[in-house]
Amino acid sequence: MSMTGSSAYYVAHAIPPFLRLSNKTMLLLSTPPTTFFPTSTTPRVTLLSSTSSSSSSSISLRSSTAPSPSCSSVTPKDNCLASAKHSPPNMSASVSSRTFLNAQSEQDVFAGIKKEVEAGSLPANVAAGMEEVYNNYKKAVIQSGDPKANEIVLSNMIALLDRVFLDVTDPFVFQPHHKAKREPFDYYVFGQNYIRPLVDFKNAYVGNMPLFIEMEEKLKQGHNIILMSNHQTEADPAIISLLLETRLPYIAENLTYVAGDRVITDPLSKPFSIGRNLICVYSKKHMLDDPALVEMKRTANIRALKEMAMLLRNGSQLVWIAPSGGRDRPDAQTREWVPAPFDISSVDNMRRLVEHSGPPGHVYPLAILCHDIMPPPLKVEKEIGEKRIICFHGAGISVAPAISFSETTATCENPEKAKEVFSKALYNSVTEQYNVLKSAIQGKKGFEASTPVVTLSQPWK
């Protein structure tokens, strides 16, 4: 329900040399508006305790210990692409129907779905997806052990189904650079509240919190920060924000993500994407799915790169990138999850983009472990509407010190070797951090999994 990784496209000669990326260029998940300091009116999200209440569309949300992860799947039956060609940009997502907001019970929710299908205003395949998501989300949240699980599920699912139905009737159109929609409905808070009860915060960790604080200081100085990261689930953006929001709310709210077309077209994903800052591109893994659309996709991706370049020139930008080109998958033989290899050209393209932007830039390797919460299909699928699995589980993120291209490649004999060495250094750091998170969360070692390289903490406490 949130972002995916990478895009491939050829760049026209009109693009400046430093923007001429190879046909393996990845998805860039990118950064906030130009002002660093939030105003007093900017909504804030903090981790809610079991006695606190949430703003926006959801009730109090929290995590609690569960005996074991609870997983349930949802498979939208058909392609869920919503046509938006007749909709003006950014006009949707502002009003609401009362079909779901008036619901007082689970029975009312399902009756509302049936009513809209019979009225011809809700496609049957989307309705089926709604019902399955409700049931599977409910199972996962109940497994968390929260005594108010049913209340949480009803509140959050009413909010989600209302937004999905609104988008089906009036599709939201994403611009190449999409800024998170925070009013009149706060989609960011909505997404945080929806994913929060799926995270076992007792078994969640942040690695090297002082480095995240260091990044915020550099942003204040006008520097650009690039996070080269592995990518695990559609929920990655929410997981990152949830683990940082208590201590570093600005970073949590202002990361910008380069999103593939799938998460800005699937009705069940779009409400979560609307709440994030995005650079919208076409994924390289799906670039050739329809030969007739290849040129259009490449042109759109060039526009997205120009938007990225403009953002970086402003400085104080925080960019999250998945240079693997997509989500991690388990090894076919061992079934173990490991970070997918980084695409060398993707890493180098982003490095050059940052170097030519003007303000100082820093590249940090970041690891994320959260695949149990919303694991992807075992293989890449062409059709929109993948099978989704929803679980209650621990999660973690970790960042290592920035890696300098010039220092890392000082002894390299040629540019191609330098690209390879730099990409490998980033990937190796991500893998090392990932293994620490894995030991802490899945190996149940907790803080004892900390190493001289990765110090684990729980900054929400």
UniProtKB/Swiss-Prot annotation:
Residues 47-88 are annotated as: Disordered. It catalyses: sn-glycerol 3-phosphate + an acyl-CoA = a 1-acyl-sn-glycero-3-phosphate + CoA. A motif (HXXXXD motif) lies at residues 231-236. Residues 47-76 have a biased composition (Low complexity). Its main location: plastid. GO terms for biological process: CDP-diacylglycerol biosynthetic process; phosphatidylglycerol biosynthetic process. It is an enzyme of class 2 (transferase). Pathway: Phospholipid metabolism; CDP-diacylglycerol biosynthesis; CDP-diacylglycerol from sn-glycerol 3-phosphate: step 1/3. Keywords: Acyltransferase, Chloroplast, Lipid biosynthesis, Lipid metabolism, Phospholipid biosynthesis, Phospholipid metabolism, Plastid, Transferase, Transit peptide. Gene3D superfamilies: Glycerol-3-phosphate (1)-acyltransferase (3.40.1130.10), Glycerol-3-phosphate acyltransferase, alpha helical bundle, N-terminal (1.10.1200.50). It holds the Pfam family GPAT_N. GO terms for cellular component: chloroplast stroma. One of its GO terms (molecular function) is glycerol-3-phosphate O-acyltransferase activity. Residues 1-96 form a transit peptide. It is found in: Plastid, Chloroplast stroma. Its EC number is 2.3.1.15. InterPro entries: G3P_O-acylTrfase_chlp (IPR016222), G3P_O-acylTrfase_N (IPR023083), GPAT_N_sf (IPR038114), Plipid/glycerol_acylTrfase (IPR002123). The HXXXXD motif is essential for acyltransferase activity and may constitute the binding site for the phosphate moiety of the glycerol-3-phosphate. Belongs to the GPAT/DAPAT family. Esterifies acyl-group from acyl-ACP to the sn-1 position of glycerol-3-phosphate. The enzyme from chilling-resistant plants discriminates against non-fluid palmitic acid and selects oleic acid whereas the enzyme from sensitive plants accepts both fatty acids. This is Glycerol-3-phosphate acyltransferase, chloroplastic. The lineage of its organism: Eukaryota, Viridiplantae, Streptophyta, Embryophyta, Tracheophyta.
